[in-house]
Curated annotation (Swiss-Prot):
Belongs to the elongation factor P family. Disulfide bonds: none annotated. Pfam families: EFP (PF01132), EFP_N (PF08207), Elong-fact-P_C (PF09285). Keywords: Cytoplasm, Elongation factor, Protein biosynthesis. GO terms for cellular component: cytoplasm. The keyword NAD does not apply. GO terms for molecular function: translation elongation factor activity. This is Elongation factor P. It comes from Wolinella succinogenes (strain ATCC 29543 / DSM 1740 / CCUG 13145 / JCM 31913 / LMG 7466 / NCTC 11488 / FDC 602W). It is found in: Cytoplasm. Pathway: Protein biosynthesis; polypeptide chain elongation. The keyword Iron-sulfur does not apply. One of its GO terms (biological process) is peptide biosynthetic process.
Amino acid sequence: MAYSMSDLKKGLKVEIEGVPYKIVEYQHVKPGKGAAFVRVKMKSFFDGRVLEKTFHAGDKCEEPNLQEKNMQYLYHDGDHFQFMDVESYEQIALSDEQVGDVAKWMTDGMTVSILFHNNKAISVDVPQVVELKITETPPNFKGDTSSGSKKPATLETGAVIQIPYHVLEGDVVRVNTELGEYIEKVK
């Protein structure tokens, strides 16, 4: 299916010259003279670069052949991350580059969403909120409890976040994976 200028909106996935993009910014412009046009910023699913493009009336772009699958993260063998399709039990291996920054939030057995373009894995998404155990954080000292103060903490996955002083080593915390921020301590 082809999208016309009027179909474009933020969050829409489009394909231009064989590359799938997600529209991250959308602006409809009506100049005083001439025809209206749409200016968009699109992020590539392949390499993450952002492309700015202007669409005029009559311009078309294609809908990409994208398929999203829920897969279970099994383990990391040093070179690749191993995933299993939860429906067909088929396993795939993705390189560190294919998985990207979300690797720091993944734990064994976690269900992740993998996006495929023409049956090739192009991105991995983890849930927006995950629960992880704190494996290392400095001890608290008297007087450390001033409001708004935070300290660094290393999570079970190796990621480092800032946490409040009342949270201790061994505690489980909820983390926003998009922002990389502490949300709350799990009771």
